Amino acid sequence: MPTPLSLQALAKKVLATQHISKDHLYFEILWFMVAFFDAYSL
């Protein structure tokens, strides 16, 4: 199960390796957070 820290590290890695818009990055982080908390609640 991913942890918030691993997701943060993933986001930083994506920023360092790809040129994406901030809106897209926000959407990806939000999606990961929702998936994480949904899995945690099960």
Curated annotation (Swiss-Prot):
Q: What triggers production of this protein?
A: Expressed in the early phase of the viral replicative cycle.
Q: Which UniProt keywords apply?
A: Early protein
- Chain's role: Plays a role in virus cell tropism, and may be required for efficient virus replication in macrophages.
Family of this protein: Belongs to the asfivirus MGF 360 family.
Q: What is the protein name for this chain?
A: Protein MGF 360-20R
Starting at the broadest rank, the lineage of the source organism is: Viruses, Varidnaviria, Bamfordvirae, Nucleocytoviricota, Pokkesviricetes
